[in-house]
Amino acid sequence: MQQLNPSEISEIIKSRIAKLDTSTEARNEGTVVSVSDGIVRIHGLADVMFGEMIEFEGGIYGMALNLEQDSVGAVVLGDYLGLAEGQKVRCTGRILEVPTGPEMLGRVVDALGNPIDGKGPIEAKQTDAVEKVAPGVIWRREVNEPVQTGYKSIDAMVPIGRGQRELIIGDRQIGKTAVAVDAIINQKDSGIKCVYVAIGQKQSTIANVVRKLEEHGAMENTIIVAASASDPASMQFLAPFAGCTMGEYFRDRGEDALIVYDDLTKQAWAYRQISLLLRRPPGREAYPGDVFYLHSRLLERAAKVNEDYVEKFTNGEVKGKTGSLTALPIIETQGGDVSAFVPTNVISITDGQIFLETDLFNSGIRPAMNAGVSVSRVGGAAQTKIVKKLGGGIRLALAQYRELAAFAQFASDLDDSTREQLEHGQAVTELMKQKQYSPMSVAEMGVVLYAANEGYLKGMEVEKIGAFEAALLDYMNSEKKALMDKINEKGDYNGEIEAEIKESLDQFKATQTW
């Protein structure tokens, strides 16, 4: 047996000691005190920051929302059923981030950016913070480019510009989502990237939206962020912020994006649930005091930013380009009550609203937009020339019709001018009807609006107006394609184009093909 030299033994021990890793990792740990309804109370975590990600045992994450004297209130991001009292929790030193970039287009993800469409992982090259400060006043530009929804009634009377926030408000089941989805479908050739955020909806409804976007070739241009009714309140609360971050990726690089929040009422409900479980003091309708700030900080991130902002953000890589993020938030009212807390909040934050009415919907007028109450505060500057010039007469005709129709119910004999106005208003109301998934081009809108303004519908039976419009558009797209292409190119309207439209309408009316 070999004898070991004591000096050799000491050398081996010394070398082992020299190689020993004695570095220490400071970890701020706490202990779970209670778990209930997705809310966790934690003892410890003295250095945790507001909004910081915290990690539970088993790789589950949470977000610190209440920082109290001797405990922390956190919301669990995901399934909380595996958490138990006494488990360890640690700080991560990070705030919540989601993957962003063009790799997200065409995919359906949850509020944390994880794919849920079964198409495999997303190879996103970067992540961005979910909560961001909106661009300051100095970086913003005026809204001066249009977002065409494809609905003639909206584009003519309530125009939407790139960088605007336009609220879609109304009771349940009257076509709010239909308007927003059609607006997304209409962007498939416009270069505008789209984000659709589904909050608290049935999974079957979300699947139907995905299917319709795929059918119309718009899905490859769209990101869908889904927090369904079966997801925790924390995910429904975070989904709009995650979707906004994904849309901002394009805005900050000199591109245009459109985001639909469907709907913010359910986000407010989720936030109310979280706040009450965190024992925050309730205010009006049991909402917490900062529910206005919840929506204002989200919607202020939709903006049109100037060339300097884009150049600074991209470190000089993109020059001379403006970027925009246009928001279409949806709010669901109860019994048409727009004076409730959340609707009044969002109306005051946005740049206008499209008000959909149950009575109009039930009487067959779709989209069921009330033209008298609906308004766009900044979109007029962004309208195409032809729609702006010809759309003014439509709003006036509908306003006069609504006023006269109320009096006509009580009057037995009407003079000729009043009867003409009533008939014209009826014809225009019928003309403003439009089927879902059938968006119109600028040229098609221009021709239809010109026909309404210049008396081409006069004396026509209301039942035949739909057939007249369909036949007119078929004729214009086949026989007058050069004129339609010229209008679509720039949306201009001048004496020459007016004369060509008039000549085309006269020729069509002579054919009597409807």
UniProtKB/Swiss-Prot annotation:
It comes from the Bacteria. It is a peripheral membrane protein. It is found in: Cell inner membrane. Gene3D superfamilies: 2.40.30.20, ATP synthase alpha/beta chain, C-terminal domain, P-loop containing nucleotide triphosphate hydrolases. The record marks 374 as: Required for activity. ATP binds at residues 170-177. Its EC number is 7.1.2.2. It catalyses: ATP + H2O + 4 H(+)(in) = ADP + phosphate + 5 H(+)(out). GO terms for cellular component: plasma membrane; proton-transporting ATP synthase complex. It is an enzyme of class 7 (translocase). The keyword Metal-binding does not apply. Keywords: ATP synthesis, ATP-binding, Cell inner membrane, Cell membrane, CF(1), Hydrogen ion transport, Ion transport, Membrane, Nucleotide-binding, Translocase, Transport. One of its GO terms (molecular function) is ADP binding. PANTHER family: ATP SYNTHASE SUBUNIT ALPHA, MITOCHONDRIAL (PTHR48082:SF2). Produces ATP from ADP in the presence of a proton gradient across the membrane. The alpha chain is a regulatory subunit. Belongs to the ATPase alpha/beta chains family. This is ATP synthase subunit alpha. The lineage of its organism: Bacteria, Pseudomonadati, Pseudomonadota, Gammaproteobacteria, Oceanospirillales.
